[in-house]
UniProtKB/Swiss-Prot annotation:
Organism in which the protein naturally occurs: Xenopus laevis
Keyword annotations of the record: Cytoplasm, Methyltransferase, Nucleus, S-adenosyl-L-methionine, Transferase
Record family assignment: Belongs to the class I-like SAM-binding methyltransferase superfamily. CLNMT methyltransferase family.
Protein name as annotated: Calmodulin-lysine N-methyltransferase
EC number annotated for this UniProt entry: 2.1.1.60
Gene: camkmt
Lineage of source species: Eukaryota, Metazoa, Chordata, Craniata, Vertebrata
Any one annotated GO CC term: nucleus
Reaction(s) the record says it catalyses: [calmodulin]-L-lysine + S-adenosyl-L-methionine = [calmodulin]-N(6)-methyl-L-lysine + S-adenosyl-L-homocysteine + H(+)
Cytoplasm is among the record's keywords: yes
Subunit structure: Monomer.
Compartments in which it is found: Cytoplasm; Nucleus
Pfam family, one: Methyltransf_16
Function: Catalyzes the trimethylation of 'Lys-116' in calmodulin.
Length: 318
């Protein structure tokens, strides 16, 4: 009898993969039980046990590159969404009003919507990419820019939109709820003033949807993307989407942690698709220094394999 393991919308079997499924170690079984308990507490909206935080990817949630202040003058949304003022600590002239979850997500949405990871929080890689784009805003001057998989805030793409003398910024995600939220953020009066005469828009874009990709083929000078490499079933689609969205002379900037071998697998697929890749581990002095301090002083919560994003720069070679 074949063993089967569900992965998103697909099922992988031991025979189909050409390998015997290994029996999980006791440590792995213990982590799995802890994750189920963590999920149960989250669904019951209980305070999470400190002992369970070690199995949560979100136990580390920020490189502290942005100050985040709740905008209490704006009425809290009924679905646990709250407006916050995001201001870059190192470039305080750049600030935006963002809305995202401040409580437990709706369970029905989690179970029925397409890839809800971007609706959970602003992930560290997105935060780092937003900061990096602000520090290097001149590279976007006069260009058409697209953010892929930006979640419910598209923080990095929005920071490009308010800081760079950019021609166009398109903010995308595969989740409809995420893009509805991004659209509301764009239309927020305080934010609209920051965009000036720049073209800033949002739309649902699934990398595996031919119509979504073909409508924008060859349109962008730069594609940016953060922490979108971990889903096995969409990794090849992401590579294909990036290649097709870019102009012949275009490039992509991808920020992502290793997460086992997922980063390497993405690089292999990208090279096979005709990209040259520059891989940077130390691309910003402040982030590198903070990374070193985290490894030394916060090892209980900080795992560089899960949390420290590398920078990949992809350029077309064919």
């Amino acid at each position: 009898m074949e063993s089967s393991v569900p992965l998103g919308n697909s099922v992988r079997t031991g025979a189909a993969c050409g390998r015997i499924m290994a029996v999980p170690s006791k440590a792995a079984q213990g982590d799995a039980r802890a994750r189920w308990k963590l999920l149960g507490q989250a669904l019951r909206k209980e305070r999470l046990d400190d002992s369970l935080q070690k199995v949560s990817v979100r136990r580390f949630n920020s490189f502290r590159l942005f100050s985040v202040v709740e905008m209490k003058e704006i009425k809290r949304e009924a679905d646990c969404q709250t407006w916050f003022q995001y201001t870059c600590v190192f470039c305080p002239q750049y600030s935006l009003c963002l809305r995202h979850n401040s409580g437990i997500s709706n369970v029905a949405d989690i179970l029925t919507s397409f890839d809800n990871t971007g609706n959970v929080c602003v992930w560290p890689s997105e935060e780092v990419m937003a900061y990096y784009c602000l520090k290097h805003k001149d590279i976007f001057r006069g260009l058409a820019v697209c953010e892929l998989g930006g979640g419910m805030t598209c923080l990095a793409g929005l920071m490009v939109a308010i800081s760079a003398d950019v021609k166009e910024v398109l903010l995308t995600d595969g989740n409809e709820k995420a893009i509805k939220n991004v659209s509301d953020i764009i239309r927020r009066p305080q934010n609209e003033e920051m965009f000036k005469d720049r073209l800033v828009s949002s739309r649902v874009l699934r990398w595996d949807n031919e119509t979504d990709v073909s409508q924008l083929e060859g349109h962008f000078d730069i594609v940016i993307c953060a922490d979108c490499l971990f889903l096995d079933q969409y990794r090849a689609c992401l590579v294909d989407a990036i290649k097709r969205l870019l102009k012949p002379s275009g490039k992509a900037m991808v920020f992502a942690p290793p997460r086992g071998n997922t980063l390497s697998q993405f690089c292999n697929l990208a090279e096979a698709a005709g990209f040259s890749i520059q891989r940077h581990e130390n691309y910003d002095e402040h982030i590198s220094n903070f990374h070193s301090k985290l490894k030394e002083k916060e090892a209980a919560v900080y795992d560089e394999n899960l949390h420290y994003p590398f920078l990949l720069v992809l350029c077309k070679t064919r």
